[in-house]
Amino acid sequence: MLARLVAWNTYLLEVEKMARKKTRASAPVVQEARRAPDFPPALTDLDASGLSACARCFWAKTGDGARAWLSVVQHLMDAADVAGYLFDEYLSEHHRRLMASVWDGDQAKARAVFIFLAGVHDAGKVSPQFACQSVELAEVIRDQGLAVMRKMDYAERAFLPHGLVSQFALQDAVAAGGGDARRAHQWAILVGIHHGRYPDSEAVRVAHLQYKYQEGSVADDPRWGQARSEILEWMARRSGFPLIAPGTALPELPIAVASAYASALVIADWLASNEDYFPLRPRPDKADGKRTIRGYPELSADQQRERAERGWKRAAFPSPLRIPEVPAGEGGEFYRHRFGWPTSYRPTEAQRNAVEIATREDPDLMIVEAPPGSGKTELAFAAAEVLMR
């Protein structure tokens, strides 16, 4: 997994290139002021049963000789749900605050965005270039009237990886919903890099041309794009992300914040892709001689919650250190709480001063000199906790 977290350079160059283009503009461009989008409530009980058969027919994972699978929508639900657990129970407070910094510190919005990104990262697997890799499961897609040729017939499929299809689909969806296209591009790159690698600008240009004009494009068969859009809109409702928000703009995405989202997204995908945590399901059966999604039993909302909870428990991720805040002027209560002192105990002057200075100044290093009996042991532990926060 660590290898997937280190390839940020091309992504950073892409963002910096966009900034340079903006700076080199020969004349100032007056743009209509756009407000930040409002977040709708998340419909967390939304399962896949309400999606069209076409949106449900695409495969994301397969195994056991293609006798088992996960559909795209099932894998995306798994990734979205485990992202919620990651945000709530694994990411540090600093990590969450960094993600929320572009949302005026609102961690609920940061959480919704993270869950949405995890829930659409593999929407690009709704493409013939990916679908052709399983002969058996391509039958399920063909049953919906879509053309999937043999893998060898897609000579240029390597130029359009599914991560970039996810990226292009997301930025198109935000723009189509009335959002600012440039900001949409910044955020959509996060799903494009979910394998930890991002191609150079020329490779992205070639991929975008294929996305627009080759097999599975709007020019070829718009139903592929319609299925992706349906999945994106469904996940936006499920996670509470403002995908359709006319006249708005997502916030600027600083590199540090982008790295915070992208690194967490890699972990969410890694967990959701582990078959020990999120087992494959039986593949669709044949009906009238054809393998079809028709009649396939999707998991209910309750079953999906149980699946996500079971997967998270199996992963057994450690909980981060959670250090309580120190209320101003309450050094005594802090020490009593941290060390189990009775109410009659009072911290020494050195102990009170150390916590107050650490809270106020946030130094990188503290050196405390005090006479014996000043409580330097508890002082050191208390000050260290404040600095770690």
Task: Provide a role label for each language-model segment.
Residues 78, 82, 349-354, 379-383:
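Well-ordered alpha-helical segments embedded in enzymatic catalytic cores
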Residues 320, 324-328, 333-335, 367-371:
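Conserved coupling segment at the C-terminus of the helicase ATP-binding
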Residues 386-389:
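Conserved SF1/SF2 helicase motif Ia
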Residues 68-76, 155-156, 340-351, 373:
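Short acidic-aromatic active-site loops that bind/stabilize oxyanions
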Residues 6-327:
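Accessory nucleic-acid engagement/destabilization modules that flank
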Residues 332-367:
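Conserved pre-motif I regulatory segment
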Residues 362-383:
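Walker A/P-loop
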